[in-house]
Amino acid sequence: MSNATNNTLGSLLPQLEAAANSNSLYGGMVPNLRFNITMIVIWGILLTIHVVQLLMRQYWFSIAFICTGILEVLGYIGRTWSHSNVADMDAFLLNMICLTIAPVFTMGGIYYQLAKLIEVYGHRFSLLPSPMAYSFIFICSDIVSLVVQAVGGGLCGVAVTDGTSTTTGNHVFIAGLAIQVASMAIFLMLWFHFLFRIYISVRWEHINSRPISLSLLKISQTEVDYLYREKFHFLRLEPKRWVFHYFNLAMTVAVLTIFTRCCYRLAELVVGWDGYLITHEWYFIILDALMMAIATVTLTIFHPGFAFKGRSTSIPITPGHVDPETLPHTDDVEDILDTSDSKQFDIEKEEFQASMKYPISTFKQFMSKIANLFSSKKKAKL
């Protein structure tokens, strides 16, 4: 009995010491070592899978998911590091900044998938003037959020180093997260509007009435497919393509879980660095770690490269509310079933570069600023 008691006390001793440490950056909470090491392994596996999927499907937007994986691994390395030293600012910033901004890149990839889906189902289902507008508007919003969070994180780091108040940095950081949450809320409304139009409105159009009843569920997608864009009917109707058939559901799960996680992060910062949420790790485990894991695993199984036949099918994003092939004097000479891997790879590469040029460059600048912050802080200590 005494041995068991001693072992228990021995395992709790580091946590008790940390709780008594007034310099703790976690309000006395010690990040769980086993959990965070497990998350490093899980995210390492997911990261590897997405790299392989990028090579297999040559789907360039896998890079957005790869960026998320790298940041998640770095973030959990920071939390593991903090387990042995809860007062270490480098470990805390690595954890806080990387895990906070990681979803930005996943959402950047998701925004682009909506543009692809509008191309597949038809431009008339787009609420915005162009399918690509979804990517541009929301990726730009994420860039603003990312920059504001970077400024807030930098101000907090400098304030802690100088021994001054972090209030200003906290407020700026919260503003950045609030922009991200507001942007995602708007995207969710547009996403559900799109789903309503392709699943409910087309059935109303098919039966020429607007009943609100479960009878609509009896109408199969095959029956209403003639109301979608004919050019990509092969993607929608092939019976064995279960990845595409459930892709919209997978997207919904991913967006809702990431939105839940971002709301939690915003609430965590509003409550404060020593508030109830940040000092109780179970909230982080369920509302952050689990939510991001569900979103990423879902997008790994229902990968866009498989859903859209990334190696063999070209789905260029085009402007306007009307499908290009229906416009007068439009020569539809593109072979959408072109089996040339190199041609499709070039198309996806150009689309990726056009949509992700600014997020990638901003991310590089952001990480450079963080590195400079760490470097200057270490020099100040010396």
From Swiss-Prot:
Stretches in topological domain Extracellular: 1-34, 79-90, 157-171, 263-281
Membrane topology: Multi-pass membrane protein
Residue ranges of the TM segments: 35-55, 58-78, 91-111, 136-156, 172-192, 242-262, 282-302
Glycan attachment sites: N3, N6
Residues exposed to the Cytoplasmic side: 56-57, 112-135, 193-241, 303-382
GO CC annotation: fungal-type vacuole; plasma membrane
Domain of life according to the entry: Eukaryota
Keywords: Cell membrane, Glycoprotein, Lipid transport, Membrane, Transmembrane, Transmembrane helix, Transport
Induction summary: In response to loss of mitochondrial DNA in a transcription factor PDR3-dependent manner. Induced in response to altered glycerophospholipid asymmetry of the plasma membrane in a transcription factor PDR1-dependent manner.
Keyword Aminoacyl-tRNA synthetase tagged: no
Stretches of the chain forming a coiled coil according to its record: none
Pfam families linked to this entry: RTA1
Cysteine-cysteine disulfides: none
GO biological-process terms attached to the record: lipid transport
Subcellular location: Cell membrane
UniProt keyword Transport present: yes
Family to which the UniProt record says this protein belongs: Belongs to the lipid-translocating exporter (LTE) (TC 9.A.26.1) family.
Function: Catalyzes the ATP-dependent translocation of sphingoid long-chain bases (LCBs) from the cytoplasmic site toward the extracytoplasmic side of the membrane (flip-flop). Involved in the establishment of the functional lipid asymmetry of the plasma membrane. Regulates intracellular levels of LCBs, sphingolipid precursors that are growth inhibitory at increased levels.
PANTHER family tied to this protein: PROTEIN RTA1-RELATED, SPHINGOID LONG-CHAIN BASE TRANSPORTER RSB1
Name this polypeptide is given: Sphingoid long-chain base transporter RSB1
